[in-house]
Design a protein with these regions (language model features):
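Beta-rich, blade/repeat-based domains predominating
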Residues: 26-36, 70-84, 116-134, 167-181, ...
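Short loop/turn segments that connect beta-strands within beta-propeller blades
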Residues: 55-59, 102-106, 152-156, 198-203, ...
């Protein structure tokens, strides 16, 4: 798979240059960005322990959150997940929980499994990221054990994968988890510099190893690989590169913390202090 990607790179002719269309500089340490079923945008700012909400035109709507351990409060959260389309999940690792909010950023519930009566084989202490499948199945990256724990109804555990028992699918340092339109699961492993793919039962499928990979996104059945300089679009059904979208020289190799694909023409890139909209023209 690795060889296939690089062979396709060599035969591509000409990159498309992305153009920056809008910038929002209103963050202290923004780490994660997501969207919901209504195309609203949510930025997780770990520096202020807040979520900032924008509409699909990147117009400010509201913000919520502060440092603490109460309901709707955070302590350096690491990941925001709108994959259900209906609500928002925040990985609040230092508080050892996943918090669920509605689309107006009102608190709904928390999942905290680091408890004495919880099965040690099926609990997490520090959640790094999360994903929702089939409306209610919650998949959590357990950062302390480098694995994925599954909660079929969002609360009761049903299994794990990606641990030492997973063979080629063993994870070493998982940091991000996404899904495609077929509900296949993709995990970014920083230590392996790879995206590890599983089916929705947690069975290992394959691995994409990319030496300069920094982040990734998925829209439909297209994988977007980002190395800080360019976005490579990869067709998951054909296992081939579609094209490359390049940033201007002045914007390359900045410290980007996340990427979100709005359409094939519009991309959001997140930095510590800035959210920027990039357009393919």
């Amino acid at each position: 798979m690795l060889l296939l990607i690089f062979l396709n790179f060599f035969i591509l002719r000409g990159d498309t240059l992305l153009t920056k269309e809008k910038t929002i500089s209103d963050f202290q340490n923004a780490l994660s960005v997501t969207t919901d079923g209504k195309e609203n945008i949510y930025v997780l700012d770990a520096g202020t322990n807040q979520i900032v909400k924008f509409n699909n035109k990147l117009e400010y709507k509201k913000r919520n959150g502060k440092q603490g351990w109460g309901e709707g409060q955070f302590d350096y959260p690491t990941f925001i997940d709108g994959s259900s389309g209906l609500d928002i999940f925040v990985s609040d690792g230092k508080n050892h929980r996943i918090q669920r909010l509605d689309l107006e950023l009102n608190y709904i519930s928390s999942l905290k499994t680091d408890l004495p009566d919880f099965n040690v084989e099926l609990k997490f202490r520090t959640p790094a990221a999360s994903l929702i499948l089939n409306s209610s199945e919650l998949y959590v990256i357990d950062a302390d054990n480098n694995r994925i724990v599954v909660y079929k109804d969002g609360r009761n555990p049903s299994g794990v994968f990606g641990d030492y028992k997973s063979g080629k699918g063993q994870l070493i340092h998982p940091v991000k988890i996404l899904k495609d339109s077929r509900n296949f699961i993709y995990v970014l492993d920083k230590e392996q510099k790879a995206i590890v793919r599983f089916d929705n039962l947690g069975n290992y499928l394959n691995k994409l190893e990319i030496s300069d990979l920094e982040n990734f996104a998925i829209r439909g059945n297209t994988l977007y690989l980002f190395n800080g300089k360019e976005i490579t679009r990869y067709d998951l059904e054909r296992s081939s590169v579609i094209d490359k979208l390049s940033l201007p020289e002045s914007s390359r190799k900045k410290k980007y913390t996340d990427i979100l694909v709005l359409t094939d023409e519009k991309y959001l890139l997140l930095k510590k202090n800035e959210l920027s909209l990039w357009v393919k023209k």
